[in-house]
Amino acid sequence: MIRPVLFSLSLWLPLMVQAEQVSFCKDIAPILVAQCQSCHGGNKVKGDYRVDTYARAMKAGSSELPAFVAHRLDESEAYFRLTAEDEGDRMPAKSDPLLQEQIALFKRWIEEGATFDGDDPFANLSTKIPERSHPKAPEHYAMPVPVTALTFTPGGDALYVSGHHEITVWSCQDGTLLRRIGNQGERTLALAMHPREPWLAAAGGNPGRLGELRVFHRDTGELLHILAKANDVVLCAAFSPSGNLLAVGGADGVIRLYQVPHFEDILSLTNHSDWITALAWNASGDRLVSGSRDKTSKVFQLPKGNRLITYAGHEKAVNGVFYHPLKDNVFSTSADGSLDQWKVEDGKRQRQLSDGLQRAFSLSLSKAHLFITSSKTEVEMFELENGKRTATLAGPHQNWITSSAFDPQNNRLATGDHDGMVCLWDIRSRKLLHSFVANPQKTSKP
């Protein structure tokens, strides 16, 4: 009795293994996102061919030859490109060819019918691929990594700094490295700390391929949520003052609102026509202001998300916004070098604080002062009450100051630059407390 059973299993098991089809979402989409989307996505469309959705990937490009034809390898232009021996024909262009294992997946998928196993063939592939673990951060950095995001813990005892595939955590007392939070995208472009819970929101991704917002436990580094998946980077994030809402914006031009603590997606705002570069809340948490590469800033009324006003006073991309802590005014700064204060009531400029900042990068706000960083190597400080420039913070920065964060508990400002330098300033005395290079290899002061 045993031998017939074993014999039948020996015939049946290979058929079971062969019956498992190649999954588009699990097997094919991750390759398209990682290897092809940077040249054939929403931001760059070479050969008039896109792969950022299943529906687009199946269409012909400028060659007018269909990319994938079910059961027909010889008629599938994309398969020809993936396997071509001539480097001029082969894709990915100017890059290593796909691994043989990856090409074999495409071959089987086409032979099996090139089917879609998701629920929406028009959805971005980044929303369909399984949740991924990012590469491990290097033990140390061979060269400095630009500091693109900073945030303090609510008590101001530690500073969280963007890194390469990680977020590094540094002591505010002496600038020593405390810990490293891995499993993060290639770049971190914004950091936001929840006002009460130990949650850190990290926006970023892999440029041109993947965007996402990851929520970590700030103390343990545990990954709690992955939100706002997109086909390009997420650029900004902001918790409301009460912490009950999280606003997220990115290169897809959409502002997404999440209900905390479960981080449920409750609202999408599509009023901008280009990247969302900055987000900030008013003091009561019922209004959200945005900045965009479309040269405008907008104010929305929550919870419905009605647009109240659009400010169009800048000539280039808006890359920093803040709500006045006491008035219904907004501060916005632009790549054109301007820093404007304008009224939400009518969208008219109240005053222009500065128009000679070269390229402005970030804004930070205290109850009495506004701080702006730019392509200069100094931080400019303005009085909120009268809009006058009252001080310039100059220190060891030797390159563009690309990020900043304010610590209201201790009245300190942190700034980070393109060379990986981080400075901590005391605002009362307007003096540098200390500085360090945010490189895990170099924990000593410069």
Model-flagged regions — what are they?
Residues 17-148, 152-157, 163-164:
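Aromatic- and Gly/Pro-enriched helix-to-coil junctions and flexible linker segments
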Residues 140-147, 182-188, 228-234, 270-276, ...:
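WD40/WD-repeat beta-propeller blade N-cap
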Residues 150, 167-171, 211-216, 255-258, ...:
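WD40-repeat beta-propellers
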Residues 154-155, 195-196, 241-242, 283-284, ...:
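Residue-level detector of Asp-centered blade-edge/turn motifs that repeat once per structural unit
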Residues 159, 200, 246, 288, ...:
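Hydrophobic beta-strand positions that form the internal "hydrophobic ladder"
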Residues 162-164, 203-209, 249-252, 291-294, ...:
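Conserved strand-to-loop turn within each blade of WD40 beta-propeller repeats
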Residues 172-175, 217-221, 260-263, 302-305, ...:
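Short loop/turn segments that connect beta-strands within beta-propeller blades
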